[in-house]
From Swiss-Prot:
Entry-linked PANTHER family: HISTIDINE--TRNA LIGASE, MITOCHONDRIAL-RELATED, HISTIDYL-TRNA SYNTHETASE
Chief location bin: cytoplasm
Record keywords, A-Z: Aminoacyl-tRNA synthetase, ATP-binding, Cytoplasm, Ligase, Nucleotide-binding, Protein biosynthesis
Name listed for the protein in its UniProt record: Histidine--tRNA ligase
EC number assigned by the record: 6.1.1.21
Length: 427
């Protein structure tokens, strides 16, 4: 009797990429470069759950937004509680600030974070269902200088990676004084248009969301809609003008985009987006803005805040569009080749010493001859190969070969670490 064997074949979830060498090195370099810019400005790291109470996002992000209405991964846990994989970072940070009383200490609370976020979107280049972001949040101070600092951090993060073809677009979405009047004006304009039923419902519920509609036919109909920048209160206008003055002084270039509407309901006053022409129609690589009512809306003090989220995946695509790469392209600096059992132990000991000194070392495994071992060394991308055989151990010698030139010398075992470090140290 022959037993049948089931063969399994698994693929990753649709719209979610795997990152592995060498591409993963570039991904890590982009993420860390963007985070470093925030840390240098005094922002501390915060780690948050990847899922939260669904009501947090419904209330914080806005029930009429596409994010909440169409894009969230929501499910019931085993306690029959509705939870959602986080679609963005700000609501979770604000929840943590309120829950742990961080807003009761020194202000502003300055936090940064990185990690995966989840949106059920149509998969396409740079639009993944698991998107990787770096974000910052500054909570507790309503100061246009802080807005400028947050924007400057993002600008500096991109430039630190060598990215220079991006553009900062900025506007103001007003405050509680002018928004209600503008909302009424916009609603009157929209309801006279020949809108489909769903769009008309959004116009009645939250007219700003209609301006965020990406369908060409809707954009054409709303092209003549009133612009919020023309209806700012004196306070909102002064705030926006001061932000621009700071950006001018800091030499951060920008373009005012009066028709920008971000996809999240909590934005007020300063709102911005970084775009890159190399990404086509889906050109955004990051954005953010001020959210002065969100703390109160989520049950906290009436404190202001500002932040951003920058797409790691999309920044990497923008770099590639400019023909640039970042990060280490090789996995190791040194490749250890052992010929014989005693040699294998000696190479492992040397590798441990070099790794402790901060040198990246990979080793040959399995029984290979010298030719196969050296081919593996060449493919590793290492600059140096350590070659040890059982005979060399008796003579207290280790072969140190420059893999670029092929030059090889014999070095005493006790001198190998110093010799290697001297060779790979920056000149």
């Amino acid at each position: 009797m022959t037993e049948s064997c089931t063969v399994f074949s698994f693929s990753g979830p649709k719209g979610i990429p795997d990152y592995f060498p060498p591409d993963s090195a570039q991904f890590v370099a982009v993420r860390d470069g963007l985070l470093t810019a925030a840390r240098r400005a005094g922002y501390g790291d915060i780690e948050l759950p990847v899922f939260e109470d669904t009501a947090l996002f419904a209330r914080g992000v806005g029930e009429s937004t596409d994010v909440v209405a169409k894009e969230m991964y929501t499910f019931a846990d085993r306690g029959d509680r509705s939870v959602t994989l986080r679609p963005e970072g700000t609501a979770g940070v604000v929840r943590a600030v309120i829950e742990h009383g961080l807003d009761r200490g020194a202000l502003p609370v300055k936090l940064c974070y990185a990690g995966p976020f989840f949106r059920y979107e149509r998969p396409q280049a740079g639009r993944c269902r698991q998107l990787q972001q770096v974000g910052v949040e500054a909570i507790g101070v309503d100061d246009p200088a802080l807005d400028a600092e947050v924007i400057t951090i993002a600008d500096a993060g991109f430039r630190s990676l060598g990215l220079d073809g991006f553009q900062l677009e900025i506007t103001s979405l007003g405050d509680g004084t002018c928004r209600p009047q503008y909302r009424k004006l916009l609603q009157e304009f929209l309801l006279q248009l020949d809108l489909d039923e769903d769009t008309r419902r959004r116009a009645e519920l939250n007219p700003l969301r209609v301006l965020d509609d990406k369908r060409p036919q809707v954009q054409a109909m709303t092209a003549a809609a009133p612009v919020l920048l023309d209806h700012l209160s004196d306070g909102a206008k002064q705030h926006f003008d001061t932000v621009l003055a700071h950006l001018d002084a800091l030499r951060v270039p920008y373009v005012i985009n009066p028709r920008m509407v971000r996809g999240l309901d909590y934005y007020t006053k300063t709102t911005f987006e970084f775009v890159h022409p190399g990404l086509g129609a889906q050109s955004g690589i990051g954005g953010g803005g001020r959210y002065d009512g969100l703390m109160r809306q989520l049950g906290g003090q009436d404190l202001s805040g500002i932040g951003f989220g920058l797409g790691v995946d999309r920044t990497l695509l923008a770099l590639h569009a400019e023909g640039k790469t970042v990060g280490e392209t090789t996995r190791c600096d040194v490749f250890g080749v052992s010929l014989g059992e005693a040699a294998k132990l000696k190479v492992a000991m040397l590798a441990g010493q070099l790794r402790a000194a901060g040198v990246r070392v990979d080793l040959i495994y399995g029984d290979r001859g010298i030719r196969g071992a050296m081919r593996a060394a060449g493919r590793s991308g290492a600059r140096i190969a350590l070659i040890v055989d059982d005979c060399a151990i008796k003579a207290d010698g280790v072969g140190v070969r420059d893999l670029a030139t092929g030059e090889q010398i014999s070095v005493a075992v006790d001198s190998v670490v110093a010799e290697v470090i001297s060779r790979i140290a920056p000149s």
